[in-house]
Design a protein with these regions (language model features):
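Extracellular glycan-modifying ectodomains
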Residues: 1-260
Length: 260
């Protein structure tokens, strides 16, 4: 929506974002620029995104200040709420499996000596578990991750059957940044009677939501189908399990893991 005119400095920032998003043929022009840079000038990096073997990667560096903030925040939560039983699980960056950098290794090394109960999932995943045009993991490839989490939580794993629902026009966040023509990914979301019956309460919106918001598949960010995207505080109620509670401090990677 066009930004409201109010007496503060945010209007022009919002206007700039609005015009950028509503510029006619904006993505087409970006793809032409990306095509010329990549195919004519052999420039394989655009907006800190590069391509290797028909797969897009976001170039990054280890931010030790951010890691220190994570350690401090975890310590604060543990102390404030007197938590004794917790696990810290790190999902590796996709770059790790393409040998583009050592960021995941540096994160594991740094946090591994500063945090108790730190677990890396590097050995459980591979490049094929990630989308080609996005940074995230494919939900249908998360079996080993879910098994590891259940093991850490001392919960018996059960055989659960899912229906596989697919959408074959998923262009991830890295696609828009790289701005070159590529085949889309296929995004899959798993359902069964249990997941269909579960409701997700959004504290910030004060609303009951479904586990999957299928309408998001037609949005600019189809990955938001999982748990309705970047919500700050969600409560998932499973009436079949009343004697256990799991609290997750998450980022977007966990959106597709938590329902499982």
């Amino acid at each position: 929506a066009f930004p409201k005119i109010i007496d503060n400095n945010n209007f022009f920032d919002d206007l700039d974002k609005y015009l950028s998003d509503h510029f006619i043929f904006r993505q087409d022009f970006r793809e032409v620029k990306g095509f010329v840079n990549y195919n004519l000038f052999n420039i394989s990096i655009n907006n800190k995104v590069t391509i290797k073997d028909d797969c897009l990667f976001e170039l990054t560096e280890t931010n030790y200040k951010s890691l220190d903030n994570i350690v401090a925040k975890v310590d604060e939560i543990i102390t404030r709420f007197d938590i004794n039983d917790y696990e810290f699980i790190a999902i590796p960056l996709k770059n790790h499996y393409a040998g583009l950098d050592n960021v995941s290794e540096e994160i594991d090394e740094y946090l591994g000596v500063r945090m108790d109960n730190y677990h890396s999932l590097k050995d459980l995943l591979s490049l094929s578990d990630y989308y080609r045009t996005d940074i995230h993991l494919k939900q249908e490839r998360l079996g080993s991750v879910v098994s590891k989490i259940l093991e850490l939580c001392d919960v018996e794993e059960k055989d659960i059957e899912y229906s596989f629902n697919t959408y074959d026009k998923f262009y991830g966040s890295l696609y828009a940044k790289m701005a070159i023509s590529m085949k889309p990914d296929t995004i899959t979301y798993l359902t069964n009677d249990l997941l269909n019956s579960i409701k997700v309460y959004s504290v910030e919106d004060k609303d009951l939501l479904d586990v999957y918001n299928v309408s998001e598949l037609e949005s600019l960010d189809p990955y938001s189908i999982y748990l309705n995207g970047p919500k700050a505080y969600l409560k998932i109620v499973n009436k079949n399990v009343e004697d256990r509670k799991l609290i997750i401090f998450r980022d977007s990677y966990t959106s597709s893991i938590a329902p499982l």
